[in-house]
């Protein structure tokens, strides 16, 4: 016969949610930092190609 599982405590649920949110926050910070370095032209570890269309638009 099927038996329902025990309920997860509020504290355990809150800890898991906090860990998940912190991982998302770290990814957000890293992506924003990379975007800033690309826009300012100081990126050392990220290489990308520019096309003629892009360079004509900036002039």
From Swiss-Prot:
Keywords: Chloroplast, Plastid, Ribonucleoprotein, Ribosomal protein
GO-annotated molecular function: structural constituent of ribosome
Membrane-spanning residues: none
UniProt record, GO biological process: translation
GO cellular component annotations of the record: chloroplast; large ribosomal subunit
Localization per Swiss-Prot or TrEMBL: Plastid, Chloroplast
Alphabetical list of PANTHER family matching this protein: 50S RIBOSOMAL PROTEIN L32, CHLOROPLASTIC, LARGE RIBOSOMAL SUBUNIT PROTEIN BL32C
Family statement: Belongs to the bacterial ribosomal protein bL32 family.
Protein name stated in the entry: Large ribosomal subunit protein bL32c
Organism the protein comes from: Physcomitrium patens (Spreading-leaved earth moss)
Gene: rpl32
């Amino acid at each position: 016969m099927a038996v329902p599982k025990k309920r997860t405590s509020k504290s355990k649920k809150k800890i898991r949610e906090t860990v998940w949110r912190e991982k998302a926050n770290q990814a957000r910070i890293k992506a924003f930092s990379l975007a800033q370095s690309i826009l300012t032209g100081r990126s050392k570890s990220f290489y990308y190609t520019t096309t003629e269309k892009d360079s004509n638009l900036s002039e």
